[in-house]
Design a protein with these regions (language model features):
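Structural signal for the C-terminal ends of transmembrane alpha-helices
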Residues: 84, 126-131
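Alpha-helical transmembrane segments
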Residues: 71-77
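Interfacial/capping segments of alpha-helical transmembrane domains
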Residues: 87-97
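Flexible, solvent-exposed coil segments and beta strand-coil junctions
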Residues: 97-102, 186-188
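A generic alpha-helix surface/boundary motif
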Residues: 75, 88, 119-120, 150, ...
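Interfacial helix-start motif at the membrane-water boundary
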Residues: 101-121
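Alpha-helical transmembrane segments of multi-pass membrane proteins
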Residues: 78-88
Length: 306
């Protein structure tokens, strides 16, 4: 029809189009009778500790206005708590009348050295080798969050040089609450100046927030894990291992790092679910033909999906 409408000069260019149409139809007929074999979906690669590390690290600091505001609040809140004597008053109060005994404080201190990493380690190892990709991703999110959180907290501890609170029964006060040493050249492993921010608190909040970010639809997670993390933070104050401002800073840092990385791992996992169809273990090219028409004539568009 187009040939007659556009004149006989257009007849020859249309011939390859009609030949291509016949060839496509023939291929479709042959393919319909070909044995398919065992059709399966290619399993997407499972996420691990280093997946999206650099982009997650960047998002942690300036990925959103909320994150930026949280980081700004860390030194601001510390300054307010220190200069209004809240640190000294709270630690003095728990030194005079502790909520629980020393053995409980010691339990939290020792357990906090590894407790935050246990659930994520179990999920990752099981999910990566035997379970689902989602389970592995949930575990990897927490492990990466703990690693990033640990590096940040260690750097801040080294830079701030803050001593631990020590209650003086003679004066009835907890001194050195305003003491920081920002001269990193004077810092050392055995200096005892490693209190700001609280690593135990930040690790627990990073664990909780990573779960929260990865499983936002599980409403029980924030109501269970955040209070448990807060309990760890209070134990650090009750045992005079940390000042109140140490715990507040640690909780803020852990929450920002954990939730950001957990949320990003959920997005990365969702992106890996677009798998490629396979037949007998070999990828199959999915394609289709679409007719096109314009003022210049007719044609066929061949689209391939792989």
């Amino acid at each position: 029809v187009s040939a007659w409408r556009n004149g006989m000069n257009n007849a020859l260019p249309l011939a390859p189009v009609f030949s291509l149409t016949a060839l496509v139809k023939a291929c479709q007929v042959v393919a319909s009778y070909a044995p398919l074999g065992n059709t399966s979906a290619a399993a997407p690669a499972k996420l691990h500790f280093f997946s999206g590390l650099w982009s997650n690290l960047a998002d942690t600091f300036w990925g959103s206005p909320a994150n930026i505001a949280a980081w700004v609040s860390v030194p601001v809140a510390t300054s307010i708590i220190v200069n209004t004597n809240i640190d000294e008053r709270v630690n003095t109060a728990v030194s005079r009348n502790p909520v629980w005994g020393r053995s409980t404080d010691t339990f939290f201190l020792q357990t906090g050295n590894f407790a935050a990493a246990v659930p994520h380690s179990i999920l990752f190892v099981y999910g990566y080798f035997w379970g689902s990709g989602e389970t592995a991703a949930a575990g990897a999110a927490g492990l990466q969050a703990l690693g990033v959180n640990g590096a940040i907290v260690f750097g801040l501890k080294w830079a701030s040089g803050r001593p631990r609170p020590v209650y003086d029964a003679t004066t009835g006060t907890t001194q050195r609450d305003k003491e920081f040493n920002f001269n990193i050249a004077e810092q050392s492993i055995d200096s005892g100046r490693w209190r700001w921010p609280s690593g135990h608190t930040s690790s627990m909040f990073a664990m909780a927030a990573a779960f929260h970010g990865f499983y936002p639809d599980k409403t029980w997670i924030p109501f269970v894990l955040y209070p448990l993390s807060g309990l760890m933070g209070f134990a650090m104050i009750n045992g005079n291992y940390h000042w109140t401002s140490d715990v507040v800073a640690g909780a803020t840092i852990g929450t920002v790092v954990g939730f950001t990385i957990g949320r990003n791992f959920r997005r990365m996992y969702a992106g890996t679910q677009k798998s490629v169809t396979k037949i007998d273990g070999k990828p199959v090219l999915d394609w289709y033909v679409t007719p096109r028409q314009s003022e210049q004539g007719m044609a066929l568009a061949l689209t391939a999906l792989f």
